[in-house]
Amino acid sequence: MAGAKEIKTKIASVKNTQKITSAMEMVAASKMRRAQDRMAASRPYAESMRKVIGHVAQGSLEYKHPYLEVREAKRVGYIVVATDRGLCGGLNVNLFKKVVADVKSWKEQGAEFEFCPIGARSVQFFKSFGGQVSAHASGLGDAPKLADLIGTVRVMLDAYNEGKLDRLYVVFNKFVNTMTQTPVIEQLLPLPKSEDDEVAHRWDYIYEPDPKALLDTLLVRYVESQVYQGVVENIASEQAARMVAMKAATDNAGTLIDDLQLVYNKARQAAITQELSEIVSGASAV
């Protein structure tokens, strides 16, 4: 058994760690609330844009934009949104596992793939994973702007426009609630057709000034908005996962302190008993 002094030092060390994890939990909780506000503010726009584009994809247009045409998938692109920092449980690991499984299924069909990682952890993973990394972004902070992502997204759009990509997906952690964050893969291109019940009534739009000018701008903005929504959802998921992880670490530290305190008390009791035995033995000898 370790000496009482060593155990006492260990207890002090664990208490210091507990203070750090408790502070990180509170910081993550505060950041999560702000991230939720940003996510809630951008979600209606992203969902409305997705709905409109879904109906456009179902419509009977004279001008068929390349983003509406389904072609054989020879090369697949992924925009993978992960975190810049760690200490957020299995958030990134679960996301990467989902991407790897999807890549494997495409690989079995003979398709090649390339990546556009967003977030330092995503960049680090995919540079060592294999496959081409066409563009990347990191250090976006807790309140990213759409302008921070446009350059990175355009690289993948240009590749699609040039026929270098036949499918484009965005991958991120969808925020469900504080305890649940789900990794999702959403198709960006070609445009997925709406699954809305209203699709049975088919919406046909009248375009001003003309379909080509409008769709060329609208469809690019659609892709950018979906990637941005994925980023803000992932940030909210990150802060929620970090808050939960730090709370678990704080609770575990408390349990460890209690266990060490018990060991310390036993060691101190044994030391006192030993000293008393030596005193009694010495007195008997005299």
Curated annotation (Swiss-Prot):
Annotated TM spans: none
Domain of life of the native organism: Bacteria
Presence of keyword Cell inner membrane: yes
Membrane topology per record: Peripheral membrane protein
Single GO MF annotation: ATP binding
Coiled coil keyword on record: no
Keyword annotations from UniProtKB, A to Z: ATP synthesis, Cell inner membrane, Cell membrane, CF(1), Hydrogen ion transport, Ion transport, Membrane, Transport
Entry's Gene Ontology cellular component terms: plasma membrane; proton-transporting ATP synthase complex
Gene3D superfamilies: 3.40.1380.10, ATP synthase, gamma subunit, helix hairpin domain
GO biological process per UniProt: proton motive force-driven plasma membrane ATP synthesis
InterPro entries the record matches: ATP_synth_F1_ATPase_gsu, ATP_synth_F1_gsu, ATP_synth_F1_gsu_CS
Predominant location category: membrane
Cellular localization per UniProt: Cell inner membrane
Pfam families xref list: ATP-synt
The family this protein is said to belong to: Belongs to the ATPase gamma chain family.
HAMAP family xrefs: ATP_synth_gamma_bact (MF_00815)
Subunit-structure text: F-type ATPases have 2 components, CF(1) - the catalytic core - and CF(0) - the membrane proton channel. CF(1) has five subunits: alpha(3), beta(3), gamma(1), delta(1), epsilon(1). CF(0) has three main subunits: a, b and c.
Function in brief: Produces ATP from ADP in the presence of a proton gradient across the membrane. The gamma chain is believed to be important in regulating ATPase activity and the flow of protons through the CF(0) complex.
Protein name per Swiss-Prot or TrEMBL: ATP synthase gamma chain
Upper taxonomic lineage: Bacteria, Pseudomonadati, Pseudomonadota, Gammaproteobacteria, Alteromonadales
